[in-house]
Amino acid sequence: MNTNNNSSGSNGPTSNSASSMYNYTHFKDTKYKNAQGTPNRNFQPVPYTEEEHQRIQYLLDKVLGPEYVSFRPGGGGQKVSYIEGWRALNLANEIFGFNGWCSELISSQVDYFDTHGNTGRISMGLSVVVRITIKDGTYHEDFGYGYIDNAKNKAMAFEKCKKEAFTDGLKRCLRCFGNVLGNCLYDRTIISKIQKVRLPAPELEADNFHRDPLIVQREMKKKQTVGVNIHESAENNTDNTNNIPKGNDDNGATNSNENNSNNVHSKQKNSATSLQTPISNRNFNIPNSTSQHRDNNTKPRASHPSQPGGPQQHSKTSSNNTPAPKNYDIVGDFDDSLVFSDDLPMDDDEMSHNDGLDDYELQMLIHKNRQNGGTDDPALIARSSYAENNENSNSSGEVNPTNNSVQEIPDQPALFVSAKRADALQQAPKDATKIPQFDAKYVSPNIRRTLDHSKSVPVRRSEISQAPHDKPRTNIGPPKLLNRASPGPTISNSNTNNLGKRMIGLPPSQKPPYKRRHQDASLSQRSKPDETSQPSSKAVPQDTNPSKDKENQPARVASSKNLEDINNMAQVT
């Protein structure tokens, strides 16, 4: 350990021009330590009791669990096990108590301090000696080391090295007390077992957080306010259900029922198809016990036929044929949103008021009633049609107390028929059994089929190539050059795909021959005398003998044939 001091007597670096290294003196301050290096403060050790001694010894003999051990890559592709500094401090507080141990920095020394040229980067290494003392006076000392390479400045280098060195010395001192403080990490058998254990991800709970008391108090008040509001809303709901009046079963609805039932109105739809019984005629009867159920044995409503005789007569029949008030038994606690909803379900009798009419039929009835001088009220029209249907059904002797207007037609089975038979089936649906059904599996003998469509099997390529309708296509090769003139190659429009590209414009057979850009030197020389024969005839007298002209004519024809052959070759290429 280097203990050289500078000339001023204070702790500081001594320059060394040879190695550019700074050596710091040993930490010795008379304020904290005396000349012998022992603490100058008054320390009174307190011995452990027998129970405390056994408890601490029992905990120190245990082995660290896998949640306390960490791994980092080491040399040779191996992993190095270690315990993190904050975990070691928590274990020391758990075993010795938060006031049962203390740590001291005994000495600090800079091993090397290098500056890298003009870059200002710093590399240094620092070692410290740390002592840990427990309550009964037992202590352990060990060294710690910290280093850094290429630090930006001195402050960063010293901060990192001192913290790393002190933490390293602290962990090395604690491991001297027992296995649970890190000494078990040097046993490879224990490490091999720890590596096989897989831990679940840690879950943090709200109770484990240390919160600000003011924030916690605000959150508690907010929760209480929300709870009170929910409780008050629940009480209001129960009060509203208890305030629903009881209906009068014999004499109809009372005045109070009418006032309350006006609030319970059905949803008024934009279309005229919403023909429901007015909600004012409904009575809600709340039983005293929760075991009472709805009475399903309701009497069918008597139908009174009406005779269409004008608008006044329609209004009378509508007032006389108002349905009897119904009692809805609401059992026990119920939700207000169900009772005071706009979408209350209709009974069978109420559904019969619509008479199975859709929008189109209802509009037709309104239009017809206008022509007859009747009313435009869709409810009255629907009720009149309902009464007429009841009258017709009663006259025929058929009685249906629940739904007299709608006569269900038995469902006909689905049939497959041909297009010719479809019109006949629509005109006479009762004769569906007489019409022959269409056989979807019928195979016409006039259509040649190369594959069996009745089953799903893989098709080989050879079977497709041997199909009877696939005829081999012959590739048209270049035309042979003959001594006589021959037209260019003709390509049919059906086999244009054999050309290998998409043809645009006229087909090749109708295109004009390509322009001959290059000509043989011999042919050009051979054709020159023929072309220049006319100008030369002016200077030389021509022979008028026809026999000589006939002798010269085949030579000219031969030369023209040669030119046509050359044109054909150019088109092929």
Swiss-Prot record:
Q: Compositional bias (Basic and acidic residues) at which positions?
A: 449-473
Q: Could you tell me which residues belong to the region Disordered?
A: 1-20, 228-330, 388-408, 446-573
Record's keyword annotation contains Cell wall biogenesis/degradation: no
Q: Which SUPFAM superfamilies match?
A: dsRNA-binding domain-like
Where do Low complexity bias regions lie? 250-263, 388-400
Q: Could you tell me one molecular function GO term of this UniProt entry?
A: DNA binding
Q: Which Pfam families match?
A: Rad52_Rad22
> According to the UniProt entry, which residue ranges have a biased composition of type Polar residues?
235-245, 269-291, 304-324, 489-499, 521-545
* Family to which this protein belongs: Belongs to the RAD52 family.
Q: What is this protein called?
A: DNA repair and recombination protein RAD52
